[in-house]
């Protein structure tokens, strides 16, 4: 029985990967921005790349204490440029990331979902999460999408505040 469950789960993940591979193809602009955050420290906001995936996985594990889902890692290996925004420091080290994906059940809607936003601890409370979300919104603003959605727990004030500051409307579902 366990084997059948695992097989069915893998089939669902493959369906998600296939759907996202098609939907994300050439969906965003190639935009790079640089922001001064202190003396000699310049942060670069840019599209993700597969070469940064290991750094993103490690930062995610540090922040959320759980790894990224393996099927997401597989998807981002091929569609990092379309589905990931990152912030790197002067040494090309990832200090923040914004991960996106599409829901197959919403195939008829043009909505991309923000899955995770992570900012390294020493850079938190400096507005980088807000700037990263705003940067991501600009990259996807090509007229193809009807919207970007995000989820945050109602008691997660920090997440709700950064979402609101970056232009998201807060609704309770």
Segments predicted by a language model, with ranges:
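Short amphipathic alpha-helix that is part of the acyltransferase structural core
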Residues: 28-70
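Conserved GNAT acetyl-CoA-binding A-motif
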Residues: 140-153
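Conserved acetyl-CoA pyrophosphate-binding loop and the N-cap/start of the following alpha-helix
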Residues: 123, 127-135
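Polar/charged side chains located within well-ordered beta-strands of beta-rich proteins
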Residues: 45, 60, 85, 98, ...
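A short, internal acetyl-CoA/4′-phosphopantetheine-binding micro-motif in the GNAT/acyltransferase core
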Residues: 116-125, 152-153
């Amino acid at each position: 029985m366990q084997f059948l469950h695992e097989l069915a789960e893998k089939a669902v993940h493959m369906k998600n990967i296939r759907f996202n591979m098609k939907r994300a193809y050439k969906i965003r602009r190639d935009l790079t921005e640089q922001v001064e955050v202190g003396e000699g420290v310049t942060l670069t906001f840019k599209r993700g790349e597969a070469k940064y995936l290991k750094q993103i996985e490690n930062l995610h594990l540090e922040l959320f204490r759980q790894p990224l889902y393996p099927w997401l890692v597989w998807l981002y290996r091929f569609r990092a440029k379309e589905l990931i925004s990152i912030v790197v420091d002067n040494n090309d080290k990832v200090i923040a990331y914004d991960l996106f994906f599409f829901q197959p059940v919403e195939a008829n809607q043009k909505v991309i979902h923000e899955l995770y936003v992570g900012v390294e601890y020493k850079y938190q409370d400096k507005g980088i999460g807000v700037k990263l979300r705003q940067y991501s919104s600009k990259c996807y603003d090509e007229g193809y999408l009807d919207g970007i959605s995000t989820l945050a727990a109602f008691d997660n004030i920090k997440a709700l505040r950064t979402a609101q500051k970056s232009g998201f409307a807060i609704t309770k579902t």
